[in-house]
Amino acid sequence: MSTTSSKVAIKPLEDRIVVQPLDAEQTTASGLVIPDTAKEKPQEGVVLAVGPGRFENGERLPLDVKTGDVVLYSKYGGTEVKYNGEEYLVLSARDVLAIVEK
């Protein structure tokens, strides 16, 4: 079972995970710089911490993701959190769409 282990002092509960979004491309192919206000929200990030899983029928269900995985997640899923000057995303495991294979 994957349990919480993190590089960050945020410990997610139940089936939640803490993700650090990867920076989206900052310039276009032709070299134009895209301002922050026009950027798409990233949908890819690195898992920094994993909760212990949720209970169902008295048993804890393990999560499919683990710390260090690069995941694709729902565009509008999760809650943005700023902690110690860093921005993180706290997602429910159901908001994770896929794990990116290395």
UniProtKB/Swiss-Prot annotation:
It is found in: Cytoplasm. CDD domains: cpn10 (cd00320). The keyword Transport does not apply. Gene3D superfamilies: GroES chaperonin. Its main location: cytoplasm. One of its GO terms (biological process) is chaperone cofactor-dependent protein refolding. InterPro entries: Chaperonin_GroES, Chaperonin_GroES_sf, Chaprnonin_Cpn10_CS, GroES-like_sf. Keywords: Chaperone, Cytoplasm. Belongs to the GroES chaperonin family. This is Co-chaperonin GroES. It comes from Streptomyces griseus subsp. griseus (strain JCM 4626 / CBS 651.72 / NBRC 13350 / KCC S-0626 / ISP 5235).
